[in-house]
Amino acid sequence: KLDDVIAGFYTAEDGRANAVDLTMSLARGAKMGGAKIIEGVSVTGVNQDNGKVTGVSTTMGSIESPYVVNCAGMWARQFGEMAGVNLPLQAAEHYYLITDDMDGMHRDLPILEDPDSHAYYREEMGSLMIGLFEPVAKSWNLERIPDNFSFGEIEPDWDRMAPFLEKAYERVPASAELGIRKFFCGPESFTPDLSPLVGETPELNNFFVACGLNSL
């Protein structure tokens, strides 16, 4: 549906990557460069001396390092608190649905973003994915993100999301005629101004952050 569209922008050099595959590729590259990756270990403290980071304490002991990078996703705020660093970051509910198979869908189709509908659309394994970003999203676990929450889901609130879903269907009317294969709600972390937090922190030298990237 385009009769209400005033203008559009096509950015030919944009693209998307599978987050899991990209992470595994970065991990392989790091190992090739000599890095050692330790999984299933929790950081219990950030060690510092005279305003500068010296390493971390973990459930397997201490690791000395002149640099520490906080890229803990929605746990980054809690990790920062260990170092005395304040990171304005909050997890909020994010929704998307995947339709049944849709004719004409293929991997080379561009991603469509529609700010007025608070939605984005893209191909997903021969189906259409519709992602919804509410103007004011519902926060999730204000006090603390559970340490053991990983790849989990939140019970979706159909009543609250129905108006946004109906608006999203209007842009691609054919999607409303398809069945829903998956309606997903999960937490993603955002900053108040929707800008990512990247760089060295002012509170602690050599303590870097890369978080809030879902705000992009």
Residue map of PLM features:
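Helical element adjacent to the flavin cofactor pocket in flavoenzyme catalytic cores
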Residues: 9-67, 71, 75
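General beta-strand structural signal in soluble alpha/beta enzymes
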Residues: 37-39, 70, 130, 180-181, ...
